[in-house]
Amino acid sequence: MAAKLKKGDKVVVLTGKDKGKQGEISAVFPKENKAVVDGINIAIRHQRQTQTSQGGRVAKAMPIDLSNLALLDKNGKATRVGFREEDGKKVRFAKTTGDVI
């Protein structure tokens, strides 16, 4: 099955501590059904000092389940994603507006 959400998509968080926040997907893990969104689901990780990097507490965006994310359409509203064929190619489209993503 094709991915409904891809790297670079603008999304909004539907549930959890970051509900309502918006961000851009920076990485997708299809096997785990998760994605990393910039500025969302931030956790503090303790990093050991090395010769190249300084140690300490580092804020890191952790993966969030794809079911907790919704794509933002051109109007800035959350939408579901559908697939259809146009000119022999499978394309994604926003179900609220019908526009190709």
UniProtKB/Swiss-Prot annotation:
CDD domains: KOW_RPL26. The keyword RNA-binding applies. GO terms for molecular function: rRNA binding; structural constituent of ribosome. It holds the Pfam family ribosomal_L24. GO terms for cellular component: ribonucleoprotein complex; ribosome. Keywords: Ribonucleoprotein, Ribosomal protein, RNA-binding, rRNA-binding. Belongs to the universal ribosomal protein uL24 family. HAMAP family: Ribosomal_uL24_B. One of two assembly initiator proteins, it binds directly to the 5'-end of the 23S rRNA, where it nucleates assembly of the 50S subunit. One of the proteins that surrounds the polypeptide exit tunnel on the outside of the subunit. This is Large ribosomal subunit protein uL24. It comes from Paracoccus denitrificans (strain Pd 1222). The gene is rplX.
